[in-house]
């Protein structure tokens, strides 16, 4: 299992660019048309040929420390042996085979019954490279609001065409099944087949978005997150979480915290208590970079979903500044935006207002809800551009975070342009914990 790089796919598509520069930042006038993206049909991703063939294979980190992997797949029949994963050390001749036995389940949703969902955890894996975690470089890609449209396909193609990156962090809104009548669960199956060419070979980790809730009282489906929780397992118990909707993992020199925008988070709630304890566990001499994933953005200058993350921001932002979180990735808004390092935690006694101010101990907030979903682009930014916004564009695309060492990382966002990705935004990042200094593009 490689921990040498960490890459980050954020999602976008567009044409030629013009930039409007203000004291606030850059608003790119390069915008993709806002009409909904055309969704690929169910027939685009048929079940694989062969008797009881496994499908929708995906892998995710299986513990907090990175020494385990969860292998997940779906099969139409639950036969003997169909729940076993055989594995061995890559450098061996295969004679030291080991088996991992999967848990098996199936779920019903309205008039749909899933195939047999298997999740097997393989443990005691070796790090590659086997060197100090704090010195490891890392590339992670981030997606959000992907769906399964032709625009989504371009985003995934561009990501897979880039040789960098060994992991994906997905910031919510996967299949968009609930955009269809009765939350058509077949769209969960087609989505699993769609992303399998990547998700079966590189570990994906997920945050849950609003489209994972799948709450439909009109058809008596009142268990939130039922399809998502059954299909996508995460190692939440390894970080002492009580829910798969919030958890943490360590990957090379990075500590990654996943939060839930759609679960209770106020004082005395399980998520609040867990995060308070979790931040105390972060050892910056071991994992120098601290990254948070949350679906609804806290800083967003788009009219779509404006201020939806405000109550969560008020609850947790002081902790993020105190603990010098480096980056917060969000989705939800179907556009791209990067903030400056700002905080809004101090009350102004003069005018009674609380406004964002420059703060070198604060995170950069990046919205990457631009994966290519069926609903199209959110192309209505507020005017003028607020002072906290550094760059924004109404397009689809992907991004790459290259963590070079314990103090420096390079971030790029690539808009989709026809059959290639073009770098539209970039910045060198300096670790908040060691170098709380101004950063440059």
Curated annotation (Swiss-Prot):
**Active site positions, chain numbering:** 305
Cited Gene3D superfamilies: 3.60.21.10
**Annotated Fe cation binding sites:** 145, 173, 176, 334
Q: Name one GO molecular function term.
A: acid phosphatase activity
* Entry annotated with the keyword Signal: yes
Q: Which cofactor does it need?
A: Fe cation; Zn(2+)
- Tissue specificity: Specifically expressed in flowers.
* Residues carrying sugar: 111, 153, 283, 348, 405
- Please provide the record's keywords in A-Z order: Glycoprotein, Hydrolase, Iron, Metal-binding, Secreted, Signal, Zinc
Family indicated by similarity: Belongs to the metallophosphoesterase superfamily. Purple acid phosphatase family.
Q: What is this protein called?
A: Purple acid phosphatase 11
Q: Which organism is it from?
A: Arabidopsis thaliana
């Amino acid at each position: 299992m490689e921990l040498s790089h960490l890459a980050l796919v954020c999602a976008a598509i567009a044409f030629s660019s013009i930039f409007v520069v203000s004291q606030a930042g850059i608003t790119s006038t390069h915008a993709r048309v806002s009409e909904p993206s055309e969704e690929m049909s169910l027939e685009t991703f048929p079940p694989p040929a062969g008797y009881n063939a496994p499908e929708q294979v995906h892998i995710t980190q299986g513990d907090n420390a990175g020494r385990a992997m969860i292998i997940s797949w779906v099969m139409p029949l639950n036969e003997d042996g169909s729940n076993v994963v055989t594995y061995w050390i890559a450098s061996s001749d295969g004679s030291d085979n080991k088996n991992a036995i999967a848990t098996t389940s199936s779920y019903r949703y309205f008039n749909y019954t899933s195939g047999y969902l298997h999740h097997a955890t393989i443990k005691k894996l070796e790090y590659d490279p086997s060197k100090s975690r704090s010195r490891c470089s890392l590339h992670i890609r981030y997606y959000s609001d992907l769906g399964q449209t032709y625009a989504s396909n371009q985003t995934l193609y561009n990501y897979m065409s880039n040789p960098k990156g060994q992991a994906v962090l997905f910031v919510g809104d996967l299949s968009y099944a609930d955009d269809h009548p009765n939350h058509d669960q077949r769209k969960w199956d087609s989505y699993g087949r769609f992303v399998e060419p990547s998700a079966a070979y590189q570990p994906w980790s997920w945050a849950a978005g609003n489209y994972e809730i799948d709450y439909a009282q009109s058809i008596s489906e009142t268990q939130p997150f039922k399809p998502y929780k059954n299909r996508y397992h995460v190692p939440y118990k390894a970080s002492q979480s009580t829910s798969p909707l919030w958890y943490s993992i360590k990957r090379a020199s990075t500590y990654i915290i996943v939060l839930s925008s759609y679960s209770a988070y106020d004082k005395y709630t399980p998520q609040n208590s867990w995060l308070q304890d979790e931040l105390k566990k972060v050892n910056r001499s071991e994992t120098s970079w601290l990254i948070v994933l949350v679906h609804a953005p806290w800083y967003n200058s788009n009219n779509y979903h404006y201020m939806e993350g405000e109550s969560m921001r008020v609850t947790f932002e002081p902790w993020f500044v105190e603990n010098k979180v480096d980056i917060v990735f969000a989705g939800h808004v179907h556009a791209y935006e990067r903030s400056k390092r700002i905080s809004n935690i101090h009350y102004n006694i003069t005018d009674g207002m609380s406004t964002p101010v420059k703060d070198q101990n604060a995170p950069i907030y990046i919205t990457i809800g631009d994966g290519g979903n069926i609903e199209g682009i959110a192309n209505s930014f507020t005017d003028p551009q607020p002072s906290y916004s550094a760059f924004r564009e109404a397009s689809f695309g992907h991004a790459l975070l290259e963590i070079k060492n314990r103090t420096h990382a390079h971030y790029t966002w690539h808009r989709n342009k026809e059959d290639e990705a073009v770098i539209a935004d970039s910045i060198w990042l300096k670790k908040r914990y060691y170098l709380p200094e101004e950063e440059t593009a």
